[in-house]
């Protein structure tokens, strides 16, 4: 039998739009208050995916208190209860002041990673990705005291050693990923899922389609054989790198700044090449509204033709498995065994 694809939104886990919620750990709060906050946040979040930002600025130059760790535990417990899939980001800044709010030395960041790891690992079935290195403005690894590739590598390796291998890690740019792993070769099917740092290190991008450079993600100079491993390539080079890498690890973030690169046809082409699987549902509204007010026009037989650009992108984030054909081979005279043949395509 030949089947036709539906155009409806599928409730597949670990993909789609997400909603952001942020909480500041503080000894002025009790774990019960943090639990109540998270219950409210989860209840107001219509999406299975949640970007949970945990601000550690109150502990920049001290250990995280037991009370604060208990708050984190209660928050993640509520996420489990609400059946959320959590993209987790620890940070020290929400106000563009990371240079002054980050810890004064690298060992303190490593200490914080060690402290949070047991709680995070307890909820490894709920935490999908741990984004970033705790550093930079809004945890985006920029304008940081720890932006050197050797410092970034140390933090990621600390996360790799402490955080459950069931949880993906993520860095901001392909260049950073290459510099951390000391290789220009993207992850292959042979090494995918083998438990190594290379197999779990993914990307997040909070400047998706914001400019030709995705707001600092790419550069205008082609990579050379003698380029530093963490050097940024051109847009076309980095899109190809992501196309290869992100068949096996997640890639997502938020779109920003209304411009030609996020016009619908351009957006569909580049989001597809990047294998984008998750996007912020609230930012940038100018871009999201542009998609909502545009119409996708596919081929005459395309079931999505005529839907809004937003709906097309929403239904294609991440994977979308479609059964294309099925048949049964059964000969009762010859055997009691039947063979079922199914052809499945991923149209995401």
Feature locations, PLM:
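Boundary/entry segment of secreted carbohydrate-active catalytic domains
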Residues: 1-49, 53
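Aromatic-lined substrate-binding rim segments of carbohydrate-active enzymes
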Residues: 34-93, 106-109, 163, 167
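The substrate-binding groove and active-site-proximal loops of carbohydrate-active enzymes
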Residues: 56-67, 96-107, 136-149
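An active-site-proximal structural segment forming one wall of the substrate-binding cleft
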Residues: 67-85, 102-131, 150-162
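Catalytic-core regions of glycoside hydrolase
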Residues: 129-288
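Catalytic cores of secreted or luminal carbohydrate-active enzymes
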Residues: 266-330
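Structural beta-strand segments of beta-rich domains
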Residues: 336-340
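Short solvent-exposed strand-capping/beta-turn motif centered on an Asx-Ser/Thr pair
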Residues: 345-348
């Amino acid at each position: 039998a030949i089947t036709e694809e539906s155009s409806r939104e599928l409730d597949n886990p670990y993909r789609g739009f997400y909603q952001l919620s942020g909480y500041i750990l503080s000894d002025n709060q009790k774990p019960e208050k943090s639990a109540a906050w998270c219950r409210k946040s989860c209840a107001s979040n219509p999406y299975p995916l949640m970007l949970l930002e945990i601000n550690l600025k109150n502990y920049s130059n001290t250990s995280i208190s037991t009370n604060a760790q208990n708050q984190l535990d209660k928050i993640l417990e509520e996420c489990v209860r609400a059946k959320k899939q959590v993209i987790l980001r620890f940070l020290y800044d929400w106000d563009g002041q990371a240079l002054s709010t980050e810890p004064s030395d690298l060992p303190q960041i490593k200490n914080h990673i060690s402290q949070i790891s047991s709680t995070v690992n307890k909820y490894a079935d709920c935490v999908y990705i741990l984004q970033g290195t705790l550093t930079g403005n809004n945890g985006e690894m920029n304008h940081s005291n720890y932006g050197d590739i050797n410092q970034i590598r140390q933090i990621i390796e600390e996360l790799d050693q402490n955080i459950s291998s069931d949880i993906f890690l993520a860095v901001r740019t392909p260049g950073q990923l290459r510099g951390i792993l000391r290789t220009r070769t993207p992850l292959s099917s042979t090494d995918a899922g083998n438990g190594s740092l290379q197999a779990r290190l993914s990307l997040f991008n909070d400047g998706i389609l914001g400019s030709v450079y995705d707001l600092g993600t790419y550069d205008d100079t082609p990579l050379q054989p003698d380029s530093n491993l963490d050097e940024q390539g051109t847009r076309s080079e980095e899109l190809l790198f992501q196309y290869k890498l992100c068949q096996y690890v997640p890639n997502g973030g938020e779109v920003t700044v209304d411009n030609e690169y996020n016009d619908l046809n351009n957006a569909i082409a580049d989001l597809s090449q990047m294998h984008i699987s998750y996007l912020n549902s609230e930012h940038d509204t100018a871009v999201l509204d542009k998609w909502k007010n545009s119409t996708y026009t596919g081929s005459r037989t395309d079931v999505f033709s005529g839907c809004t650009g937003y709906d097309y992108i929403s239904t294609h984030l991440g994977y979308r498995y479609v059964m294309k054909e099925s048949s049964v081979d059964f000969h009762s005279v010859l055997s009691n065994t039947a063979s079922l043949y199914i052809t499945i395509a991923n149209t995401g």
